[in-house]
């Protein structure tokens, strides 16, 4: 990943006297206010330099005029404090919430297209300290180091432990400087909620405000929200409570599919950046990845590509993201000493769906036995049941059911449904 790849953001909730926010350590809770739109971005520069291009109006109106994150991805100890202070100060003057991306962890992207970062963890901590000085106590939402927790395949056990310690220290340092800190949760098609909860716990999410998901990715907001609820439940079961989610919606308004698909014309920008999510578990929808900046597949990572931007700025693809939703309800149909039988009803929303997937969390030592009407997988305490070949496609408002036998105490789980 690179400044604009699938990684995360440092959302900076700035404050100024008499404005929307106050300085000092940001308290836990939902965010309010409008995000800061930086005037000098690659998209804005391209628009200014190409007034007569047929693509300019769409890129200007739908992308350049929207707030997106400012990435801190160049490791330079001589300039980073001034860069942060200037950006935070401009946002504070405007009375807006700035969004930053801290992307400087050593061995970032596991040496992939967005490789780079600090030379070692000691230098990284110095870099973080300078960023904290740049914040200067001004309330700042920080989404810390995209992919740093979800992507660990290139690290040894000792290196993972050292990275976790560095992230934990960074979170505490930035929080003490006024930061509202979010850690990397990957996305809904990556690690299970149970696995990601274990990783977040090891990286110190107890001392952070929450987690972010879908950075530089294309998964639907509905899928990410369902994943977030499961992750919050998994954290709660580990005694880590009060955490909330931020979702990158910059490019999730159309097709998902293969991540490394810069030329996928079915992809679209998603929900505009906002803190008004209508969901107590979700603090914000943010454009962490600036639309139009490449991932390092077909084009150089981080480079602005007008063709990509114009495609993303097009009309929502068919079907749009918010169609094809589903809901799930649970009931216990029978119970006995040491076990019970449950049934889940899946209902399609206002549009047809091609398939569905229901997820819930086991409690009290429960385990799943036989399942009928669906295909079950378990990961730790998380159960996921997907449709069979014959009951996945549902008309608007139509229903399907599956049942299961389980051992353990009877409970009424919170079941979530996402369309496939």
Where are these regions (language model features)?
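Short, solvent-exposed loop/turn segments enriched in Ser/Thr/Gly
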Residues: 336-343, 400-401
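N-terminal carbohydrate-binding/catalytic regions of secreted carbohydrate-active enzymes
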Residues: 30-134, 138, 290-305, 309-312, ...
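Terminal connector regions
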Residues: 327, 396, 401-420
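Low-complexity, acidic Ser/Thr/Pro/Gly-rich terminal tails and inter-domain linkers that flank the onset
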Residues: 322-338, 349
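Active-site cleft segment of glycoside hydrolase catalytic domains centered on the general acid/base Glu
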Residues: 114-138, 146-178, 193-197
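Surface-exposed substrate-engagement region within the catalytic domains
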Residues: 37-64, 173, 188-312
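Short acidic, flexible loop segments centered on an aromatic residue
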Residues: 352-379
């Amino acid at each position: 990943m690179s400044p604009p790849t699938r990684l995360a953001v440092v959302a900076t909730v700035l404050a100024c006297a008499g404005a929307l926010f106050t300085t000092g350590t940001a308290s836990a809770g939902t965010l309010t206010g409008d995000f800061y739109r930086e005037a000098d971005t690659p998209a804005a520069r391209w628009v200014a330099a190409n007034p007569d291009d047929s693509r300019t109006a769409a890129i200007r109106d739908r992308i350049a005029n929207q707030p997106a994150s400012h990435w801190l991805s160049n490791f330079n100890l001589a300039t980073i404090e001034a860069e942060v202070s200037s950006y935070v100060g401009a946002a504070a003057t405007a009375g807006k919430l700035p969004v930053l991306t801290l992307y400087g962890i050593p061995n970032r992207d596991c040496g992939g297209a967005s490789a780079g970062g600090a030379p070692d963890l000691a230098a990284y901590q110095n870099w973080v300290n300078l960023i904290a000085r740049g914040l200067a106590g001004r309330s700042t939402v920080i989404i810390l180091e995209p992919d740093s927790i979800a992507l660990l395949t290139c690290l040894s056990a000792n290196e993972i432990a050292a990275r976790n310690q560095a992230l934990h220290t960074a979170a505490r340092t930035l929080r003490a400087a006024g930061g509202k800190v979010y850690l990397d949760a990957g996305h809904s098609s990556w690690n299970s909620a149970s696995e990601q909860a274990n990783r977040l716990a090891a990286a110190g999410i107890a001392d952070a405000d929450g987690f972010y998901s879908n950075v530089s990715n294309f998964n639907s907001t509905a899928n990410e929200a369902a994943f977030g609820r499961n992750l919050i439940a998994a954290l709660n079961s580990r005694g880590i409570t009060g955490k909330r989610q931020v979702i990158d919606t910059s490019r999730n308004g159309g097709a998902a599919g293969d991540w490394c698909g810069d030329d996928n014309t079915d992809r679209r920008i998603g929900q505009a950046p906002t803190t008004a999510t209508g969901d107590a578990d979700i603090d914000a929808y943010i454009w962490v990845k600036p639309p139009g900046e490449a991932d390092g597949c077909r084009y150089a990572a981080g480079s602005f590509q007008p063709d990509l931007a114009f495609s993303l700025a097009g009309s929502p693809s068919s079907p749009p993201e918010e169609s094809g939703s589903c809901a799930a309800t649970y009931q216990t149909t029978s119970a006995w000493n040491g076990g019970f039988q449950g049934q889940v009803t899946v209902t399609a929303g206002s549009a047809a769906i091609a398939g569905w997937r229901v997820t819930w969390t086991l409690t009290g030592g429960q385990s799943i036995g036989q399942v009928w009407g669906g295909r079950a997988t378990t990961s730790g305490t998380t159960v996921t049941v997907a449709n069979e070949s014959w009951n996945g496609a549902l008309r608007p408002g139509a229903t399907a059911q599956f049942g299961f036998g389980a051992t353990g105490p009877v409970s009424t789980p919170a079941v979530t449904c996402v369309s496939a």
